[in-house]
């Protein structure tokens, strides 16, 4: 038996179930998922507080990560428009559609 799975479950029972839930669930619903709610309820109050606090912190991390990814995507889009003309010019040169001038060849 693996640690943390409770007395009544085995790693074989939990593995596929957790994988299926993780593959289709949003971060918020995954945070609420509990394979053994009775196990959590049987924990001492101090430990339950830790578990719930950790879940709350993880949810805040998920919100921050979503914000980071939105901003990262925004920066990628901004630079894609800046890189666009340069990449197009490079494509034209490599496909012999454009011949650089003497000035463009100088360093």
UniProtKB/Swiss-Prot annotation:
**Family annotation (InterPro entries):** NAP-like_sf, NAP_family
Q: Report the GO terms under cellular component.
A: nucleus
Gene Ontology terms: biological process? nucleosome assembly
One Pfam family hit: NAP
Family listed: Belongs to the nucleosome assembly protein (NAP) family.
- The entry's protein name is Putative nucleosome assembly protein 1-like 6
Q: What is the lineage of its organism?
A: Eukaryota, Metazoa, Chordata, Craniata, Vertebrata
Which gene is the coding source of this polypeptide chain? NAP1L6P
């Amino acid at each position: 038996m693996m640690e943390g799975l409770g007395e009544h479950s085995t790693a074989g029972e939990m593995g596929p179930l957790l994988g299926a839930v993780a593959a289709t669930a949003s971060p918020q619903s995954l945070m609420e998922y509990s394979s053994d709610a009775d196990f959590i309820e049987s924990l001492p109050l101090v430990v339950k507080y830790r578990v719930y606090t950790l879940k709350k912190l993880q949810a805040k991390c998920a919100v921050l990560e979503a914000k980071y990814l939105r901003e990262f995507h925004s920066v990628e889009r901004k630079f894609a428009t800046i890189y666009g003309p340069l990449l197009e010019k490079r494509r034209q040169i490599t496909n012999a559609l454009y011949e650089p001038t003497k000035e463009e060849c100088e360093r």
